[in-house]
Amino acid sequence: MTVHLLTDIEQALRSSWSAETCTPEYRDRWTPDNPARDQCGVTAMVLNDLLGGELVRGEVHVDGVRTDFHWWNRLGLGVEVDLTREQFGPEEVVVGGEVIARPPGELPRLQEEYALLRDRVAARLGKG
């Protein structure tokens, strides 16, 4: 059995991000200069596949107005892992954070993007 450190998983995720794995409606704003942009939902799902835990959703606010949602993971003992937090500019503030149950089966949104990211990460970790 191959053992992977969190740093291995993080590197596999980061090197797998692309415009094709980000939220489709924001694909036009994705750039290699900010590769974490709009990758949070699919990244949180893949990390959940690999490490378990809970999915957490917060709100992104600009000038006090919600503009989007942000997703990350909570592992055992309340340890939170957010591999895409750096996507935000200084005017964007993530507030709150509620645990959201993972939907069973295929995702209602982002299924293709999630599957592509999951498969790329699995290949990089030698599980593909």
Describe these PLM feature segments.
Residues 1-128:
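A structural boundary/capping signal
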